[in-house]
Amino acid sequence: MQVTAPRTLLLLLSAALALTETWAGSHSMRYFHTAMSRPGRGEPRFITVGYVDDTQFVWFDSDAASPRKEPRTPWIEQEGPEYWDRETQISKTNTQTYRVGLGTLRGYYNQSEDGSHTIQRMYGCDMGPDGRLLRGYSQLAYDGKDYLALNEDLSSWTAADTAAQITQRKWEAARAAEQERAYLEGLCVEWLRRYLENGKETLQRADPPKTHVTHHPISDHEATLRCWALGFYPAEITLTWQRDGEDQTQDTELVETRPAGDRTFQKWAAVVVPSGEEQRYTCRVQHEGLPEPLTLRWEPSSQSTIPIVGIVAGLAVLVVTVAVVAVVAAVMCRRKSSGGKGGSYSQAASSDSAQGSDVSLTA
């Protein structure tokens, strides 16, 4: 999967602001591009989705009745008509670029015109609390397989196969990594700062977790202690079980952080303990919204019940999220490359769009 960083020139952000403003925790911006061919059912479909942290903020779908870059959250609606016109035009240009690219790569891989194929690109940046780049990303995939990725040093590429090495040589000759690095260290972070400022009421909020511990007997000799954290934002959180003050990381069952359906998150960590020794175990909770870490124990007199409704709601949202990702990205898994030689690519000229430049696929 690939991400390409936004490259629009920011006129409203001063250098002084960039150097003095700080943000709690780290933040990220990602763009996901997906092009899907569909023989016999019209032109290939092209979709762009943009995220700041976990929040989708823009969307473009070439299948729309009147394709335009569309807002997906209130704070991005602050951008004026010029922003939306520019972003729409770039997405329309990318639509044609990816359609040509699909045909080009199909030929390189010696694939028939009957099959459906995908090109995906993911790009973006992570920003630290000091407002500077933590890490940049730019990756490309074809038919569900990694193709070419910008390395963490932002100056070299990793090719997945011999076909991708052809592209790598072309991009190295075009000094594409230098262009990507300039964007990721500059405009990508600048736009992310701008979006964080415009959406600070939601993007920079810190909702502390609601926490409790539940007890679940397994047998006469063992029980499960489950440490719950509910209703928190942002998603980053640490739950650690300790026995007599020593971490029990190896023995802890930890689920992935889940959306709760109300723009907050849920998570739990569980440990199996000998019956009668429950009070030797504590759960340590660390989150940006807490003034200091919490230490929890199971309280037998106030046995908590599992919040089934909340968990089901969270899982329902997770299913919806997966469905959206399936439209945008998971089609990668639908087909696997049939082999052959890889496509040839060249880096497109930089633009001053919030989306940044995109890859150009050439014959």
Curated annotation (Swiss-Prot):
One of its GO terms (biological process) is immune response. Residues 334-363 are cytoplasmic. Residues 25-114 are annotated as: Alpha-1. It is a single-pass type I membrane protein. SUPFAM superfamilies: Immunoglobulin, MHC antigen-recognition domain. Residues 299-308 are annotated as: Connecting peptide. Residues 344-363 have a biased composition (Low complexity). InterPro entries: Ig-like_dom, Ig-like_dom_sf, Ig-like_fold, Ig/MHC_CS, Ig_C1-set, MHC_class-I_related, MHC_I-like_Ag-recog, MHC_I-like_Ag-recog_sf. Disulfide bonds join C125-C188, C227-C283. Glycans are attached at N110. Residues 115-206 are annotated as: Alpha-2. Keywords: Disulfide bond, Glycoprotein, Immunity, Membrane, MHC I, Signal, Transmembrane, Transmembrane helix. Residues 336-363 are annotated as: Disordered. The keyword Glycoprotein applies. Belongs to the MHC class I family. This is Class I histocompatibility antigen, Gogo-B*0201 alpha chain. It comes from Gorilla gorilla gorilla (Western lowland gorilla). The lineage of its organism: Eukaryota, Metazoa, Chordata, Craniata, Vertebrata.
